[in-house]
């Protein structure tokens, strides 16, 4: 027991140190640095994590009622909920009061958790700690996750190895307790990232059938009882997520097969990487749709692991069958509906209508190859005359492949008017310009700035946009006007923030004329060359 605790502490500390090395200097500047500050998806992620981190303690029963698209409710469900990321970040948010610090902590923690989970999975399958370390680094720090640093949910990869580890433990000794552990791991992945929860569901479902066949477990009542317990626990724990998914689908949100064709992988994606040891290949690719290169170790040793594992004993062959098949199937699915498999899955699995990017199956390709690579490394070390040296060299190469140049910048400071707004009585806020649907992503900055006051916003940006918001956007965009104020009266919108920079000279002159015309209905709270802040004191 004590040895296991010591090993766990060393593993966590090791991956924390590697995370600090690869993502330096972010760990020492949680509140003042952020990756690619101007990226709108990144701004959305900062807001999302901070909202959950705050709401989980301040108003836990209203965590889904995010402060966007007022007066709609359950607006957090319009995109990834990020409940797991926000929950683990909540202590940091309350200690610092910084949305950036909360987000950055969750970002860093995702690498540590993923590395730890993959280490224990690879150790269980390869029976070699050194091989497990290399496999874990290859997966947790793969190029794909660095390409998606602005998307906090896509960094939450730990549920893949932890869920498969829980399954293997169940398969080795089926008990209700191990079934419950599997269900818990799968549910936690659902709270961390809906995309990956679908992957985990498919992977575990396939693993259950493969092991039932290869081991003859289909005749074992204990096996099916444990699997049933896992399914039941996973479903029960995921009920809130299921309800929100049904709510969103009933609201009209769904992804079409035609739309998914924009987000498919191609062969170039599996050679694309921005990591230092790989970036030279980009010049030969011309263009690429995704970043899915598994790394040199993953590709070479993954193939070796499949070959040597197939010739080994029954237990190792089981691993090759499971992870080799998962890798090939995920590769096939990542090419999208025109390749066939993705279209079949879309038609038979209801949750696929919530997915958009087939290319994200590429993460499962990296996952499977990393597992197989750890098998190859264990095989190599077992036959090596100098296993310590070989394992050290492999770890150095794995760390080298994890190194990537990252563009961290200073966090964006909110305009001082938002500080003033935070001191004012509560009330809905309209941010202008409203922006069209095409430019709706720019509203993510409004959401980020709202972390200084947390008042409800009429505006918003998310995967799903309420139809009535689009319908009223044109009227609101003319604020102040009779049509805008009449619309705002319905929801008792109290404040309006006007960002002047996007307005051209003629538009700004027209705006100022309307401000004078509707002055009896407005109280000007702040004015400078960048921003106007009004309180609506009455309506026409």
Task: Name what the model sees in each region.
Residues 36-55, 231, 239-308, 332, ...:
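Periplasmic/ER-lumenal interhelical loops and adjacent helix-loop junctions
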Residues 18-114, 138, 143-157, 261-284, ...:
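Membrane-interface coil-to-helix junctions
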Residues 1-24, 225-233, 307, 311-326:
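Start-transfer (signal-anchor) and selected internal transmembrane alpha helices
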Residues 169-171, 200-233, 306-315:
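Perimembrane helix-loop-helix junctions
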Residues 118-141, 385-395:
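Transmembrane-helix signature of polytopic, membrane-embedded enzymes
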Residues 105-125, 371-375:
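Transmembrane-helix motifs of polytopic, lipid-linked glycan transferases
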Residues 216, 396-540:
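Extracytoplasmic
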